[in-house]
């Protein structure tokens, strides 16, 4: 198997395991506490990489505000709302909703930045949105027997929160 395919499979596996492991931690620490802990760990890992590599590539001073704004919207707000969604909907549904960040980014780029979307890109947005809707709402009428399928509160409120999380990630990536 080519390395890029292995990397894609590894990333998908990490994404799936992370959603499952994060639910209990987000419930125990709360969305803000869990995100704060996670970002602290990421900062330590980044510092270790910079120390080992011996250098840090600079960012132009005029771009720092964009980086900060992107982080606040995408990582702080988007991820915090994602953890609220994870607690309310479980890892399967929240992960599916969060996958809408790519089609949302494409649509935001088209609307705000004048980017062009090909027919294939539009079809991809429609198909991925329909797939997410089926994954999230397809079992909404059936009571889940597994704790990962249990919904806390209104499904529609949780779906709205998941859409806000995906939109925050999409907007953060465009900035």
Model regions: which residues?
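Hydrophobic/aromatic residues within transmembrane alpha-helices
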Residues: 25, 34, 85, 111-117, ...
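Residue-level hotspots within transmembrane alpha-helices of multi-pass secondary transporters
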Residues: 20, 51, 80, 106-107, ...
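Glycine-/small-residue-enriched transmembrane alpha-helix faces in small-molecule transporters
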Residues: 1-33, 44, 146-175
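Loop-to-transmembrane-helix transition segments
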Residues: 3-11, 46-51, 57-81, 98, ...
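Loop-to-transmembrane alpha-helix entry segments
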Residues: 4, 57-62, 98, 105, ...
């Amino acid at each position: 198997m080519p390395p890029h395919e292995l990397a894609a499979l590894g990333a998908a596996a990490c994404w799936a395991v992370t959603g499952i492991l994060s639910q209990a931690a987000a419930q125990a620490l709360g969305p803000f506490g869990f995100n704060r802990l996670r970002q602290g760990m990421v900062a330590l890992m980044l510092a270790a990489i910079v120390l080992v590599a011996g250098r840090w590539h600079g960012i132009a001073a005029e771009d720092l505000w964009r980086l900060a704004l992107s982080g606040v919207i995408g990582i702080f707000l988007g991820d915090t709302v994602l953890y609220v969604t994870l607690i309310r909907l479980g890892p399967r549904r929240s992960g599916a909703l969060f996958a809408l960040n790519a089609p949302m980014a494409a649509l935001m780029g088209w609307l705000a930045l004048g980017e062009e979307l090909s027919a294939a890109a539009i079809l991809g947005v429609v198909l991925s949105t329909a797939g997410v809707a089926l994954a999230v709402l397809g079992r909404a009428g059936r009571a889940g027997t597994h704790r990962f399928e249990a919904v806390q509160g209104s499904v529609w409120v949780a779906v709205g929160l998941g859409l806000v999380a995906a939109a925050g990630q999409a907007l953060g990536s465009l900035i």
